[in-house]
């Protein structure tokens, strides 16, 4: 009955927009994946230390017919990594928009159903509505902080393990220690995100039984605050990384206080 009502055609059209965004998902993911590929290429070159292999220049000249310039190659890889960061920052807002459009369609569908049942009266002068807006914004920033804390905790534990157990004077990495570091980071990140998921689902389900006006305002606030927070964090990460690349590649001031600040 709701979908057949012409008054609700705009909500259906919004759903079609969400469907169109989802259809662009493979293209967006392909563009977004360029960043990690370039980042890994630069990391592989740096960790391989090919330029320090005895006789490598003569071998490359003999096999491929050109004189290798490792410094120039490193510069190109760093520049490519910077371009990859820009690609990621450009593609992520599209994925964020997909989530927001889908969430908005769901929210307006809930609003229409509650209005049809006579349970909804949204007004900014009502205390439950104001409280819902405040709680939605608070949950977004709590989620952002808790997510970063989960990843940061794993990173600190990995650094502690490296300091205590790894011999940094070795020429080759120990595979067992490397696996342990990856396991530490993965376990802490997964444990942190699982706790966040349980808390978020519990809060949302509890709010759903509190008050219809409060719950709808809570959902609207999450969609609005979440949109701007997600775009801000997606662009901030790429900007910080590119600032570090600019100091390393263009200014050639790696190891200086300026470089330490950007790191």
Where in the sequence are the language-model features?
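Hydrophobic packing and interface segments
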Residues: 1-263
């Amino acid at each position: 009955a709701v979908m057949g009502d012409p008054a609700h055609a705009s909500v259906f059209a919004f759903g079609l927009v969400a469907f169109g965004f989802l259809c662009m998902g493979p293209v967006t993911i392909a563009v977004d994946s360029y960043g990690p590929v370039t980042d890994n290429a630069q990391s592989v070159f740096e960790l391989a230390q090919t330029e320090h292999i005895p006789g490598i220049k003569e071998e490359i000249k003999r096999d491929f017919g050109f004189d290798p310039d490792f410094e120039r190659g490193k510069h190109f890889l760093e520049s490519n990594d910077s371009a990859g960061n820009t690609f990621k920052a450009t593609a992520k807002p599209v994925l964020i928009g997909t989530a927001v459009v889908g969430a908005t369609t769901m929210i307006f569908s809930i609003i229409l159903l509650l209005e049809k049942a006579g349970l909804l009266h949204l007004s900014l002068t009502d205390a439950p509505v104001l409280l819902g807006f405040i709680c939605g914004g608070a949950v977004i920033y709590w989620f952002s902080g808790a997510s970063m804390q989960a990843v940061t905790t794993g990173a600190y534990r990995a650094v502690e393990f490296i300091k205590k157990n790894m011999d940094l004077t070795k020429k080759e990495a120990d595979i067992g220690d490397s696996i342990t570091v990856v396991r530490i980071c993965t376990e802490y990140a997964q444990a942190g995100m699982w706790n966040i998921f349980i808390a978020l689902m519990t809060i949302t389900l509890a709010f759903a039984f509190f008050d219809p006006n409060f719950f709808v305002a809570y959902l609207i606030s999450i969609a609005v605050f979440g949109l701007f927070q997600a775009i801000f964090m997606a662009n901030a990460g790429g900007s910080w990384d590119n600032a570090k690349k600019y100091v390393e590649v263009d200014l050639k001031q790696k190891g200086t206080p300026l470089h330490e600040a950007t790191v």
